[in-house]
Amino acid sequence: MALSGKLSVEVTVQTPAAKYFNIFITQFHKLQNICERILEGNMHEGDNWHVPHSVKNWTLIVDGKPIKLKEKIEAIDKENKSITYNLFDGDISKNYKVFKFLFQVFEKSDGGATAKFTIEYEKINENVEAPYGFMEFFDKGAKEVDSYLLKA
């Protein structure tokens, strides 16, 4: 059984790609007020939510249970509308040595977009399940962000 793996989910949204991506690079702190499964988010290190290497604390609901973790942005590629995040510490570190996710938004010809979330992980041992619950978390969260942006 492999310890490393990759999972991804693609979510079709009605919001234009640039507007959808923009909330993640300029208003990331608002996600806790938009997404039902984000209970809390706050700065741990740094003073800007939207720059690489600033560290945030998050409490999320994944698989029906609250989990705590830290997150930092590793890279932002505005041209390709992608952000690479590293999730670590807290409950993540209990099961995974490595837990990164790539968020990317693709334009669609109808004016909407596709939001893609890809997790790359390494489990601490083979008894740990792949992080399938995060796929549901990202799917639901992406739709909540879309709904919020369509009303804005």
Where are these regions (language model features)?
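Intrinsically disordered, low-complexity basic segments at termini and long loops, enriched
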Residues: E10-Q14, L87, D139, S147
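Beta-strand/loop substructures that line and gate deep hydrophobic ligand-binding cavities in soluble
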Residues: T84-K140
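Glycine-rich portal/gate segments that line the openings of hydrophobic small-molecule binding cavities
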Residues: E40-S93
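Hydrophobic ligand-binding cavity/cleft-lining segments
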Residues: M1-V51
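Hydrophobic/aromatic beta-strand elements that line small-molecule binding cavities or substrate pockets
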Residues: V9-V11, L69-A75, F99-E107
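Hydrophobic pocket/interface hotspot
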Residues: Y20-F24, L31, K56, I73, ...
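C-terminal helix/juxtamembrane-tail motif
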Residues: A2-S4, F106, Y132-A152
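A generic structural micro-feature
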Residues: M1-L3, N48-H50, D63-I67, S93-K97, ...
